């Protein structure tokens, strides 16, 4: 454990040396990261297969491609983002230079998540490097194969002092959080997010928390249900439901509930065949603890599809629950598994009320052909982000910041927003020593009369 302090101190010394200040150095490190990924795609895929049973294609599409896109976008935009930003002048500052200067924060701690253990560890790192910080990486110990891989690869390609990787579980993370960082980025549960924030408060360290919650999916009667259900099924059951922005539950009018069930079932058959257990595209629950938690949420009396599982392989069949009571256990926590409850509401207003009576979610989804329905849902609810007539895809766009609100998190990242998150925007005014006559009015003694505006 004593080694953790020395690793963090070494990262701070490396940062204080000033070598991250030049943009060229940052670009070189991002290019090294890019090279690391491209030269080790097989190893990344193998680690993801070992932990989550992802195949080569889903590993690339769900995790790697987004990181490579982020690196490309960041390298192309960095010189513009880092330029001093002029601001409007007041009457008294017409002769001055006024601008905002972006400077690195210092040493950033990134605590990754187990469900997308490559993407959610490396993508935040991209923005932190671009902003000129040292970055201490703490991959999730739950996805142990990926943690092992990252701790091996990153020192081979990148500056060893600036970008150390620390492996371990709760004891190591607890020790890490005792250290003073200049920013902490955490992705994971709300419960642990509160622990991270409490630890950060002791050092007045700012945090970005990407948490989660129960992301609702409202399906309007005025909707192409074939398309809607295909997109919903894709987003819900990818990675076996272990996605922080997966649609957690469906809200719909009771008159279309059965039709939604049938169309979801058709999509599941199209995606995974008659038996999802045999599909190479269908994942597994990460460990026994999470497996037990998810199956405990399945009420057999409400099962319209699925509801079966295999404990040795941690397989849970894609499951649909109907006529779900809002007070039932499956509606009290983020499911984070392949179980889709359907709750019936009789109007858009009732759906909005239902959503607003609960904690603010990380994402919200609405399917409708009626723009007024979509605009009303957006205007009268709150969530980290919204996708209308699809799911999840808003987080793949680098020009849209990704983050939560309320219980689903704070702060945001992706694209330019990542650069801003990991930078201090420093207000600067540069004035000449000439023209002192114009400043005389501010000096004592005060005039007898107040000036008129």
Curated annotation (Swiss-Prot):
Pfam families: Aldedh. It is found in: Cytoplasm. NAD(+) binds at residues 188-193. Changing residue 352 to V: In allele Ald3a1c. Its main location: cytoplasm. Keywords: Acetylation, Cytoplasm, Lipid metabolism, NAD, NADP, Oxidoreductase. The modification N-acetylserine is found at residue 2. It catalyses: an aldehyde + NAD(+) + H2O = a carboxylate + NADH + 2 H(+); octanal + NAD(+) + H2O = octanoate + NADH + 2 H(+). Disulfide bonds: none annotated. It comes from the Eukaryota. The modification N6-acetyllysine is found at residues 178, 194. GO terms for cellular component: cytoplasm; cytosol; endoplasmic reticulum; membrane; plasma membrane. The active site is at residues 210, 244. GO terms for molecular function: 3-chloroallyl aldehyde dehydrogenase activity; alcohol dehydrogenase (NADP+) activity; aldehyde dehydrogenase (NAD+) activity; benzaldehyde dehydrogenase (NAD+) activity; oxidoreductase activity, acting on the aldehyde or oxo group of donors, NAD or NADP as acceptor. PROSITE patterns: ALDEHYDE_DEHYDR_CYS (PS00070), ALDEHYDE_DEHYDR_GLU (PS00687). Constitutively expressed in cornea, stomach, skin, bladder and lungs. Lowest expression levels in lungs and bladder. One of its GO terms (biological process) is aldehyde metabolic process. Its EC number is 1.2.1.5. Homodimer. Belongs to the aldehyde dehydrogenase family. ALDHs play a major role in the detoxification of alcohol-derived acetaldehyde. They are involved in the metabolism of corticosteroids, biogenic amines, neurotransmitters, and lipid peroxidation. Oxidizes medium and long chain aldehydes into non-toxic fatty acids. Preferentially oxidizes aromatic aldehyde substrates. Comprises about 50 percent of corneal epithelial soluble proteins. May play a role in preventing corneal damage caused by ultraviolet light. This is Aldehyde dehydrogenase, dimeric NADP-preferring. It comes from Mus musculus (Mouse). The gene is Aldh3a1.
């Amino acid at each position: 454990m004593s080694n953790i302090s020395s690793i963090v101190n070494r990262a701070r010394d490396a940062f204080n040396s000033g070598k991250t200040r030049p943009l060229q150095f940052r670009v070189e490190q991002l290019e090294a990261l890019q090279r690391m990924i491209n030269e080790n795609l097989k190893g990344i895929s193998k680690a993801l297969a070992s932990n989550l049973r992802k195949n080569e294609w889903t590993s690339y599409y769900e995790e790697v491609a987004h990181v490579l896109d982020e690196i490309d976008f960041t390298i192309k935009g960095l010189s513009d983002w880092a330029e001093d930003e002029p601001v409007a002048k007041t009457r008294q500052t017409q002769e001055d230079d006024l601008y905002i200067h972006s400077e690195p924060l210092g040493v950033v701690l990134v605590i990754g998540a187990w469900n997308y253990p490559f993407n959610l560890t490396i993508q935040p790192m991209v923005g932190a490097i671009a902003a000129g910080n040292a970055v201490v990486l703490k991959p999730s110990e739950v996805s142990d194969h990926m943690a092992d891989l990252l701790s091996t690869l990153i020192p081979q390609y990148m500056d060893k002092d600036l970008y150390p990787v620390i492996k371990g579980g709760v004891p190591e993370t607890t020790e890490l959080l005792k250290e003073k960082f200049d920013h902490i980025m955490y992705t994971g549960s709300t419960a642990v997010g509160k622990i991270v924030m409490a630890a950060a408060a002791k050092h007045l360290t700012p945090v970005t928390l990407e948490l989660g919650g129960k992301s609702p999916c409202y399906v309007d009667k005025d909707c192409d249900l074939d398309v809607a259900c295909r997109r919903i099924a894709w987003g819900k059951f990818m990675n076996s439901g272990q996605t922080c922005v997966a649609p957690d539950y469906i809200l719909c009018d009771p008159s279309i509930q059965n039709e939604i069930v049938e169309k979801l079932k058709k999509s599941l058959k199209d995606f995974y065949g008659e038996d999802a257990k045999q599909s190479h595209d269908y994942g597994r629950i990460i460990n026994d603890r999470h497996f037990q938690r998810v199956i405990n949420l399945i009420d057999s009396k409400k099962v319209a599809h699925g509801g079966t599982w295999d404990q040795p392989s941690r397989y849970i069949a894609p499951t649909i629950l109907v006529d779900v009571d809002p007070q039932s256990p499956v509606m009290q926590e983020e499911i984070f598994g392949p179980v889709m409850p359907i709750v019936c509401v009789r109007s858009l207003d009732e759906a909005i009320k239902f959503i607003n009576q609960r904690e603010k979610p990380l994402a919200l989804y609405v399917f409708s052909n009626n723009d007024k329905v979509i605009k009303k849902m957006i205007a009268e609810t709150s969530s980290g982000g919204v996708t209308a007539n699809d799911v999840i895809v808003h987080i793949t766009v680098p020009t849209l910041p990704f983050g939560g609100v309320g219980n689903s998190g704070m702060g945001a990242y992706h694209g330019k927003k990542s650069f801003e998150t990991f930078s201090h925007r420093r207000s600067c005014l540069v004035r000449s020593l000439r023209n002192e006559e114009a400043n005389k009015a501010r000096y004592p003694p005060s005039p007898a009369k107040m000036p008129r505006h």
